[in-house]
Every structure is written in structure tokens, then in C-alpha cells.
């Protein structure tokens, strides 16, 4: 037990070393104070320079003297024992062949690693609890056997049913014309023309809207080979904004059990852009803000807002 307490440290030299550190810090502070004050209290420039140099040299000598004193005392302090036994595990340090069987040092390393692992695991657990992915509170009571996932029925609807839904939506809105085509097989592509305001390319998989691109009424929506251009953006910032809002609307209108209602709701929302350049903002009452009309349409009331006014 006495070996554990004896760490071979000269306490008197240790106390003197602390005082030497304080003296060194004071002398270093005086050096910076001298540099901060500069040349003062002399009438002539030459006298100020000589006084400044002499004062600066004295402060540097003080720093050098205090540093040498601290180095001398550090050699007198001594080094503590490198072995810190942990109860019965301290017996492992008595192994005479430390290089061949370094059990004690490995045990200390494993102990430090375990503490770090526990600390980081606690941090990760706190972050994961803040970003919980549970969709309902009833998942804790489900059985261990997971139910087989049902295949989505939205993607396997017959093309005739899709054509009938699009045809009925086309008849609902006289100011909107919808042209349906299938250039790549069974997946439908819609070209929606809303009055003389804009054109919308809608890429569908069965009755699931996959992508929308909004362009101006006079912009070209076809590629060189005559197919609908589903990749290039509009040349006008106002229609780029409407494209972003349409993508947000696709995420809002989600009802997998009734896909026809989703398409009809989206087309109703899209039809509200018939007065894109005529309706004022419902909050600020202005027609233009930063050179743009109100490009946002509320998903429930279909009222017009500027992008910054809807916040």
C-alpha cells in the first residue's frame, strides 16, 4: 500500500515551481505591456528610442531568468510513478517480463477505450432519441414476426383506368387541356396547358405523379426528336419557382388508397395558377415583390402569396 502512495515527488520543489511559473507569467506580461506602451515620456525621438530599447531588454532578461529558474526547479520536482495499480489488477504490473506480456498496460488502454465508448454511445443515444423514426406509438407492442409488406396497388393499375381518370379530370376544367402520351411504354406523360399562362409536363407511373416541370406558355417543351423534354428547366425564374412549389405539392397530396383523388387534387391546385399574373398577394396586397408575382398557392384555400409572405 505504501508503494501506491509513494509517487517520488519533491513537494517543496513543486511549490517553488508553481511560484516560478507565476513569476514567468508576470515577466512575459511586462514584455507585452512594454510593446503596447511604446516610446513615451521623452522629449526627443532619440531619447525615446534608447529608453524603449533599454526597458525592453530588461524585460527580456527577466523572462530568460525566470525561464531558467523554472527549468531548474522542474528537474528537482521528479517524476511520478508510471504505474497506478487498480486494486487487484495492480498485481499484473509485477510481471517481470513486461515486454513479452504487457497485460497491465493493455488493461489500462482497454479501460480508457471502454470509457470513451460509453461516453460516445451516450451522445449517440441522445441524438437518435431526438430524431426518432417511429411512425406510431403502437409499434412497441407488435410481435417479433413482421407482417409481409403488401405490394402497392398504385403502380399496377391498368392503363385504361388511368386514361379514364385523366379524361374525367380534363372535362372538369374547361380552361385546362391535358394531352396524354406513352412514349416509353405503359408510363403516362401529360402535357397540361393552362390557358395562355403556362405549360406543365407531368411524368407519371400509373396514377402516381413522379415529376413535374413548369414552363411558360411560349416556351418549347419538346426535344429535337419530338419528345417531351422532362429534364430542362424553364428560362424564366417565375416558372422555376412554380416548379419548386409543384414539387412541394406532390409531397403534400398523398393518399395511396385513392390515387385518383390525389391526381384530381393536384390538378385543382395547379388550376389556381390561371391568374398567376393577375392575383395580388393575400398578405401584402402587392402584385410584384422582387420582380416576381405571387407564385405560392395555399394547398387548402388556393390563395396567392409571395414566397416570403407565406411564412
From Swiss-Prot:
Effect of residue 232 to F: In NEDSCAC; uncertain significance
Protein localization: Nucleus
InterPro entries per UniProt: Mediator_Med27
UniProt keywords, alphabetically: Activator, Cataract, Intellectual disability, Methylation, Nucleus, Phosphoprotein, Transcription, Transcription regulation
Residues that bear Phosphoserine: 132
Domain of life of the native organism: Eukaryota
A cellular-component GO term for this protein: nucleolus
Pfam families (alphabetical): Med27
Biological process according to GO: positive regulation of transcription elongation by RNA polymerase II; positive regulation of transcription initiation by RNA polymerase II; protein ubiquitination; regulation of transcription by RNA polymerase II; RNA polymerase II preinitiation complex assembly; somatic stem cell population maintenance; transcription initiation at RNA polymerase II promoter
Residues with the N6-methyllysine modification: 134
Record-level Gene Ontology MF annotations: transcription coactivator activity; ubiquitin protein ligase activity
Effect of residue 280 to L: In NEDSCAC; uncertain significance
Role: Component of the Mediator complex, a coactivator involved in the regulated transcription of nearly all RNA polymerase II-dependent genes. Mediator functions as a bridge to convey information from gene-specific regulatory proteins to the basal RNA polymerase II transcription machinery. Mediator is recruited to promoters by direct interactions with regulatory proteins and serves as a scaffold for the assembly of a functional preinitiation complex with RNA polymerase II and the general transcription factors.
Disease: Neurodevelopmental disorder with spasticity, cataracts, and cerebellar hypoplasia: An autosomal recessive disorder characterized by global developmental delay, impaired intellectual development, and poor or absent speech. More severely affected individuals do not achieve independent ambulation, whereas others develop some speech and can walk, or show regression later in childhood. Additional features include axial hypotonia, peripheral spasticity, dystonia, cataracts, and seizures. Brain imaging usually shows cerebellar hypoplasia, thin corpus callosum, cerebral atrophy, and hypomyelination.
Family under the similarity heading: Belongs to the Mediator complex subunit 27 family.
Self-association state and partner proteins as the record states: Component of the Mediator complex, which is composed of MED1, MED4, MED6, MED7, MED8, MED9, MED10, MED11, MED12, MED13, MED13L, MED14, MED15, MED16, MED17, MED18, MED19, MED20, MED21, MED22, MED23, MED24, MED25, MED26, MED27, MED29, MED30, MED31, CCNC, CDK8 and CDC2L6/CDK11. The MED12, MED13, CCNC and CDK8 subunits form a distinct module termed the CDK8 module. Mediator containing the CDK8 module is less active than Mediator lacking this module in supporting transcriptional activation.
Name of the protein this chain belongs to: Mediator of RNA polymerase II transcription subunit 27
Native species: Homo sapiens
Lineage, broadest ranks: Eukaryota, Metazoa, Chordata, Craniata, Vertebrata
Designated gene of the protein: MED27
